[in-house]
């Protein structure tokens, strides 16, 4: 079944839809922007890219759908864990998408998603308030 036909079926009635504040969002896997649109839908396309946080809380997992074996959902996804520094991680994602000519329209969205995940994994520095000495008159 073509992606366009699947989109016509899924776009208004899906268990992943969230309709709030005059906007429609989607919680489906491999939807990089969580937006209910044809381009970012993670279910209907033959090629999809997903970026998730790693299970141990360090690094990201890039999920790419295989072009072959579409009829076997259990083996149709390849999961690659990238646990490097931020610049190398983003460079790896960029190369995975660009060098394989794999959905170049999703390249920037995947990089932004990975960047946000890496930023959320950084430890937060607690700022201490400076105490002023009391004035003595």
Curated annotation (Swiss-Prot):
Family: Belongs to the eukaryotic ribosomal protein eL28 family.
Keywords: Acetylation, Cytoplasm, Isopeptide bond, Phosphoprotein, Ribonucleoprotein, Ribosomal protein, Ubl conjugation
Any one GO biological process: translation
Cross-link (Glycyl lysine isopeptide (Lys-Gly) (interchain with G-Cter in SUMO2)): 58, 65
Origin superkingdom: Eukaryota
Function comment: Component of the large ribosomal subunit. The ribosome is a large ribonucleoprotein complex responsible for the synthesis of proteins in the cell.
Compartments in which it is found: Cytoplasm
One Gene Ontology cellular component annotation held by this UniProt entry: cytoplasmic ribonucleoprotein granule
PTM-bearing positions, type Phosphoserine: 115
Modified residues (N-acetylserine): 2
Gene Ontology MF: a single term: RNA binding
Primary residence: cytoplasm
InterPro entries on file: Ribosomal_eL28, Ribosomal_eL28/Mak16
Name of the molecule in the record: Large ribosomal subunit protein eL28
Self-association and partners: Component of the large ribosomal subunit.
Protein encoded by which gene: RPL28
Pfam families the record matches: Ribosomal_L28e
Residue ranges crossing the lipid bilayer per the database entry: none
